Amino acid sequence: MARFTSIVLVLSACFVSSRAQFGFFDQMFGNQGHQQHQEPQNVRSDSSWYQAQYEGAQCTHYLCPGTLSCVHFPHHCPCAWESVEDKAELGDGIAICGSKGGWKEGEFAKKVELARKGVL
């Protein structure tokens, strides 16, 4: 009887240790086969979300299409990524945004002006 108990203990110890090892491998290799976790969904590819945001925005002046900011004039629209973009006004009531690219302050506007003159 003591021998039977020790055999049962050894087998259960082997089972527990193998279960722990396979749990480690499941976790290490993406838990394939046991539990399925849901991936976050991508943003929809149609324009309905943007249109709903645009139509729901409250603005009594001009609503910037790129940032949904409410400003007095179209050329006052901010850049969408102000930390990495500079804005240059073209003088026709139009403003464009472009990458700062590591240039000095105002360098983007100078490059746009040179390109408009055909120098760059």
From Swiss-Prot:
Residues 1-20 form the signal peptide. Disulfide bonds: none annotated. InterPro entries: LCL2. Keywords: Signal. Probable component of the endoplasmic reticulum-associated degradation (ERAD) pathway. PANTHER family: LONG CHRONOLOGICAL LIFESPAN PROTEIN 2. Belongs to the LCL2 family. This is Long chronological lifespan protein 2. It comes from Phaeosphaeria nodorum (strain SN15 / ATCC MYA-4574 / FGSC 10173).
